[in-house]
A protein has these predicted regions:
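Structural/interface elements that position substrates and couple domains in central-metabolism enzymes
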Residues: 1-171
Length: 171
């Protein structure tokens, strides 16, 4: 039973990354994707088995630049999570160092949005609900994509602003 749960979780992470790639015209190569959240759940800095690690890995492999904001997870933790995954997958040290040049971490969310092609919500932090999404939209390339992996934002409001908004499990 648990093996099936793990397989389904892995499939969902893969599907989320694929949804981002497909909606950004089948490539994220050279594109800036902003991640909101890295921890596996809100109110913690625990990143064990966080979906963000696997989604980032897939997008980086496709050439994306990942810009990350999480209120509790440090840059060194984020980079060590990715390095650990890549080492497990047998990726060379040189290749890992190259991949890490595609990862950017911010202390303030507002700094992560400028010139983003897409935003992916990967942790359900309360603060994300209270952002000024109108201002964020103005900072982004158009069409501005928002992928809500936690279904915490108001779809109607975001679409009204102009976002191409996608929720997990919904169209």
């Amino acid at each position: 039973y648990w093996e099936q749960v793990i397989k389904l979780n892995d499939y969902q992470k893969h599907r989320f990354a694929k949804k981002i790639i497909n909606n950004l015209f089948n490539t994220v190569n050279g594109k800036k994707i902003t991640f909101l959240g890295w921890a596996f759940k809100k109110d913690t800095n625990d990143t064990r088995e966080s979906a963000a690690i696997y989604v980032a890995d897939q997008l980086i492999e496709d050439g994306a630049n990942i810009h990350i904001y999480d209120p509790k997870v440090t840059e060194s933790k984020i980079k060590s999570d990715l390095t650990y995954l890549w080492e497990l997958n047998g990726i060379s040290e040189n290749r890992i160092l190259k991949k890490l040049t595609q990862v950017f971490v911010y202390d303030k969310a507002i700094d992560a949005f400028k010139d983003s092609h897409a935003i992916a919500v990967l942790t359900e932090w309360e603060e994300f609900k209270n952002y000024n999404w109108k201002n964020i939209y103005k900072e982004m390339y158009k069409p501005a994509f928002l992928f809500d992996g936690r279904n915490i934002l108001c779809a109607e409001e975001l679409r009204e602003i102009g976002f191409e908004y996608y929720q997990i499990g919904k169209i």
